[in-house]
Curated annotation (Swiss-Prot):
This is UDP-N-acetylenolpyruvoylglucosamine reductase. Pathway: Cell wall biogenesis; peptidoglycan biosynthesis. Its EC number is 1.3.1.98. Its cofactor is FAD. The lineage of its organism: Bacteria, Thermotogati, Deinococcota, Deinococci, Deinococcales. Belongs to the MurB family. Keywords: Cell cycle, Cell division, Cell shape, Cell wall biogenesis/degradation, Cytoplasm, FAD, Flavoprotein, NADP, Oxidoreductase, Peptidoglycan synthesis. It comes from Deinococcus geothermalis (strain DSM 11300 / CIP 105573 / AG-3a). The gene is murB. GO terms for cellular component: cytosol.
Length: 295
C-alpha cells in the first residue's frame, strides 16, 4: 500500500497508509497502515494481524521509521458517548451512564460532564487523550484519575470480548492492569451527582496546576514520579532544564516535559531520555510509550 492510498477492508473499515506524526501530540513518527474501525466487526478483522492501538496520541513516541503493525483508531460507534443515566444502577447520589466509546476525546467528554453537573473525572481535565487510552494507562493528575469514575470496562483482544469491573483489575498509579494487546472499546462511568458550578471549580484547580507546563508539542510527562518524589524536580536539580539535542528540548518550564521545537526526530527524543536517566541519581520509570519498544 502506497502512502495516502485508501482501501476498504472486507468489513468496510477504512485503511490508509499515513504518517503517525499527524496523530501524536509530539508530532513525531513515521508511516504505518492505519485502520479506522467503526464497530466491533471491523475491530475483530483488524485484530487478525499484529496491531497497535492509537488514541489521542499523547504519552507516545513513534520511531521515525514508523511501525510494521496495523495501527487501529476507534471511530464511529466506538467514538460515541451515551451519558444517559441507567435507571437500574443510578441513585439519588450517583449516576451510572450508558456506554462511552474508547475513541471519545477525553476533553470533550469532561466538558459534557461538567455541564451535566456530574463529578469524579474533572481531575483529568486538559489531558489530550481519548477515553480508551486514558483508561488503559489510568491517566490523571494530582486531582484525580480515570479509575475514579469507572463502573464497567469492555475490553477486546483476538481471543474475544469481555466486561470487567475495576475491582477485577490490578490498577494503580498510571496503570490499569489491563493486559497489553487488549483494546478498551467502551466503558460505563460511575459519577457523583453535583452541580455544574462545583464541577467547574474543581476543573479550575486542575487547570491551574497545568499553568507551568509547556505549550509546545509534547507527549506529556516523560517519567513517573519515583516514590512520591517529583521527577520534574529531580531533573531540574540535575541542571537539565532547557537542554537541547537536535530539535528536541527538555522544557525550560518543567523538567519532566520534552518538547518538539519543530522537526524533531525520535532519535532526538531518545537521546534526551537517555541523558536524563544518566544524570538523575535515582532510577526513573518511563511514562511514555515507545513504538517500537526499546530493548
Amino acid at each position: 500500500m502506497t502512502a495516502s492510498s485508501v482501501t476498504s477492508s472486507r468489513t468496510g473499515a477504512r485503511v490508509e497508509r499515513l504518517p503517525l506524526a499527524r496523530f501524536t501530540t509530539l508530532g513525531v513518527g513515521g508511516e504505518a497502515e492505519v485502520w479506522f474501525v467503526d464497530n466491533h466487526e471491523q475491530l475483530a478483522e483488524a485484530l487478525e494481524q499484529p496491531y497497535r492501538i492509537l488514541g489521542g496520541g499523547s504519552n507516545l513516541v513513534v520511531a521515525d521509521e514508523g511501525v510494521p503493525e496495523r495501527v487501529i483508531r476507534l471511530t464511529g460507534r466506538l467514538a460515541a458517548a451515551d451519558l444517559t443515566p441507567d435507571p437500574d444502577l443510578s441513585s439519588t447520589e450517583t449516576v451510572v451512564t450508558g456506554w462511552v466509546g474508547g475513541g471519545v476525546p477525553l476533553p470533550g467528554l469532561i466538558r459534557r460532564l461538567q455541564k451535566l453537573g456530574l463529578s469524579n473525572l474533572e481531575g483529568t481535565v486538559g489531558i489530550p487523550a481519548q477515553v480508551g487510552g486514558a483508561v488503559w494507562m489510568n491517566a490523571g493528575t494530582r486531582y484525580g484519575e480515570m479509575f475514579d469514575g469507572l463502573h464497567t470496562l469492555e475490553i477486546v483482544s483476538p481471543e474475544g470480548m469481555r466486561q470487567v469491573t475495576p475491582d477485577e483489575l490490578d490498577w494503580g498509579y498510571r496503570r490499569s492492569g489491563i493486559p497489553r494487546g487488549h483494546v478498551v472499546t467502551r466503558v460505563r462511568l460511575k459519577l457523583r451527582r453535583s452541580t455544574p458550578e462545583a464541577v467547574l471549580a474543581k476543573m479550575a484547580l486542575a487547570d491551574q496546576a497545568r499553568k507551568g507546563q509547556p505549550k509546545m508539542k509534547t507527549p506529556g510527562c516523560a517519567f513517573k514520579n519515583p516514590g512520591g518524589v517529583s521527577a520534574g524536580k529531580l531533573i531540574d536539580e540535575a541542571g537539565l532544564k532547557g537542554t537541547r539535542i537536535g530539535n528536541a528540548m527538555i522544557a525550560p518550564e518543567h523538567g519532566n516535559f520534552i518538547v518538539n521545537l519543530g522537526g524533531a526526530s525520535s532519535r532526538d527524543i531518545h537521546a534526551l531520555l537517555a541523558l536524563i536517566r544518566a544524570r538523575v541519581g535515582v532510577p526513573l520509570e518511563l511514562e511514555y510509550e515507545l513504538w517500537p519498544e526499546q530493548a
